Amino acid sequence: MYDSIIDPTLGPAADSERGPMVLAGRPENLSGLRLGLLANTKRNAEQFLDEVGKLLVDQHGVTAVLARKKPDITNTAPEPILDDLRAGCDIVVVGVGDCGSCSASAVADGIILEQSDIPAAVVCTDAFTASADAMARVRGVPGYPYLAVPHPMANLTPEGVRDKATAAVPGIVAMLTGRAMAAAS
């Protein structure tokens, strides 16, 4: 009667044929690299990423920053935005996942960039790790690493955003350079 049952939580059928995804290679440090910032439309996402960008320039020698904003929180970044990041960046910080939909799409964006051999550090708040983890599984990358910061982000004052960015930078650097992945192994 039926040929097969499709379980959408397992991801595309091709995933089992492709094998596990390999993350992009990681640099030893960020000095001289071009940084991409991919923000969604959540309140404080751009401000958080701008603060992260300033800190990475000042403290880690990033030489250029290319900021892009997605038109919505529920979908992955459109190809023209991804093309800009692929062409102009060596590393990308994606965020901020501060709700279920935007956490899932942030992880999907990170995986897409990794598939283009661009190291990505995805930032989500800790209240939405279930959504982020589910998207990683659907995309065929269970256990995809991302940085979970304390929730919430959207209602923070400018000072609170700066403080959260300052606290997040060591984890972002560890993710971009591979130190976080090595520690998890």
Feature locations, PLM:
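Glycine-rich phosphate/diphosphate-binding loop of Rossmann-like nucleotide-binding domains
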Residues: E28, L33, L37-K54, T63
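Short beta-strand elements in bilobed, periplasmic/extracellular small-molecule ligand-binding domains
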Residues: D58-P71, G143-P150
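Short, well-structured alpha-helical segments in soluble
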Residues: E79-D90, D109
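Active-site-proximal loop->helix
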Residues: V107, I111, Q115, A130-V141
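A charged, well-structured terminal subsegment
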Residues: V149-A184
